[in-house]
Amino acid sequence: MKFLLNLSRVIAALFAGSIINMCFVWLGQQWFPAPAGFKNALPIHFLFPFLAHAFGTLSGAILMCWLKPKETRRYALIIGIIFLMGGISACFMIPAPAWFISADLVLAYIPMALLAEYFFNKLIKP
């Protein structure tokens, strides 16, 4: 029973983080649309995907910490690792420059999960 409760918490946090992720991707496409036939190679076109990955992981991990306040680091890292696995798989499916892939994988997932745990313990947790 405890396992199912924790699994449902992880799924809820992943779902919320994914919604935030997609909102940032959509905003990036609305604010910085690429002209027709233009290759998205300018750095500005990679800003919002990076922000989407970072804030999606951050928000999902904060929600996970709120749902499971006794083991915040462990469960925040679970969310960060799952999002990292998605980021690694996206690297093989979506063409992007090496600088973006490396910055995304190194800065957007595990550090954001740890930052979420820090924010939760310092600012949100009563």
Show which residues each predicted segment covers.
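Juxtamembrane/disordered regions of integral membrane proteins
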Residues: M1-P126
